[in-house]
Amino acid sequence: MSQITEEQVKHVALLSKLEFSENEVKSFTDTFGKIIDMVEMLDEVDTDGVPFTMNVADNLNFMREDVAEKGLDREKLMAAVPEKEDGFIKVPAMLSDGGDA
């Protein structure tokens, strides 16, 4: 099995702004190791001569014409906003200062 360490899981959690209990760290360490083992097994499959496939489904993206349209009236929008600052909508902070991430 690939050697994924608990320190690596904790580092990824820090970068992702996630907090895990010690039991969760151990569980994720085991799970990530198994996932990497599976990917390594797939890497060993001989794909010589197999045509490149971007998508196995015949899904097509149908795009609409890009047309400029009048947006919301800024004054009406700002009148409905509970908190604003310097002409911008003020919302609660979602992330801290970033720390070591």
From Swiss-Prot:
GO terms for molecular function: asparaginyl-tRNA synthase (glutamine-hydrolyzing) activity; ATP binding; glutaminyl-tRNA synthase (glutamine-hydrolyzing) activity. InterPro entries: Asp/Glu-ADT_sf_sub_c, GatC. Its EC number is 6.3.5.-. The keyword Membrane does not apply. It comes from the Bacteria. Keywords: ATP-binding, Ligase, Nucleotide-binding, Protein biosynthesis. GO terms for biological process: glutaminyl-tRNAGln biosynthesis via transamidation; regulation of translational fidelity; translation. It catalyses: L-glutamyl-tRNA(Gln) + L-glutamine + ATP + H2O = L-glutaminyl-tRNA(Gln) + L-glutamate + ADP + phosphate + H(+); L-aspartyl-tRNA(Asn) + L-glutamine + ATP + H2O = L-asparaginyl-tRNA(Asn) + L-glutamate + ADP + phosphate + 2 H(+). Gene3D superfamilies: Glu-tRNAGln amidotransferase C subunit, N-terminal domain (1.10.20.60). Allows the formation of correctly charged Asn-tRNA(Asn) or Gln-tRNA(Gln) through the transamidation of misacylated Asp-tRNA(Asn) or Glu-tRNA(Gln) in organisms which lack either or both of asparaginyl-tRNA or glutaminyl-tRNA synthetases. The reaction takes place in the presence of glutamine and ATP through an activated phospho-Asp-tRNA(Asn) or phospho-Glu-tRNA(Gln). Belongs to the GatC family. Heterotrimer of A, B and C subunits. This is Aspartyl/glutamyl-tRNA(Asn/Gln) amidotransferase subunit C.
